[in-house]
């Protein structure tokens, strides 16, 4: 009888630990080697900024930013059904309550959304998702510590004023220029 109880407990723990729920992180890992996708990371070093000239607010925003993960699907004549399938998967993942949507705009054929993971002033991840029926889609995960919406707006202003190191964006540029 004790053996049955122990086995039942172990089996229950095993089932609980096997989370079949797909996250964006799992999706990125699964698709990173798929020929229809391009995947790369962007570090804070992409922003060539003189940190001595940054305001205190800009320094805090930059410190909260760890990296960006980019995953893009470029549509072509042979992968249109894959595009539809993958777009549905991403939409399904983003509907999970873990991802809180800040903004959504566009139509059924194309659009974009901004979501986040975490609490209002302790955001761990911002997700930018955009799709266009005749081009494909891209997902950008902005990862950091204790970010907030103001940090993102400040980072965008830093990006505008920085000399961006385009070498880190070369994989995306190569994909866009491929025919």
Each model region followed by its residue ranges:
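Mid-length scaffold segments of soluble, non-membrane domains
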Residues: 73-122
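Second-shell loop/turn segments in exported
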Residues: 72-80, 139-145, 158-160
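Early exported N-terminus immediately downstream of N-terminal targeting peptides
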Residues: 26-90
């Amino acid at each position: 009888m004790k053996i049955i109880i122990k086995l039942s407990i172990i089996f229950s723990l095993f089932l609980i630990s096997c989370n079949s729920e797909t996250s964006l992180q799992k999706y990125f890992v699964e698709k990173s080697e798929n020929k229809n996708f391009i995947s790369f990371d962007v570090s804070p070093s992409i922003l060539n900024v003189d940190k001595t000239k940054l305001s205190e607010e800009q320094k805090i925003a930059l410190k909260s930013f760890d990296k960006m993960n980019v995953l893009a699907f470029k549509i072509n004549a042979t992968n249109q059904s894959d595009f539809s399938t993958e777009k549905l998967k991403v939409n399904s993942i983003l509907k999970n309550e873990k991802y809180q949507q800040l903004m959504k705009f566009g139509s059924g054929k194309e659009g974009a959304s901004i979501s986040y993971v975490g609490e209002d002033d302790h955001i761990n991840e911002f997700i930018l998702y955009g799709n266009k029926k005749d081009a494909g889609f891209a997902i950008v995960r902005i990862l950091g510590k204790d970010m907030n919406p103001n940090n993102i707006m400040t980072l965008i202003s830093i990006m505008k004023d920085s000399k961006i190191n385009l070498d880190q964006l070369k994989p995306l540029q190569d994909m866009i220029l491929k025919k």
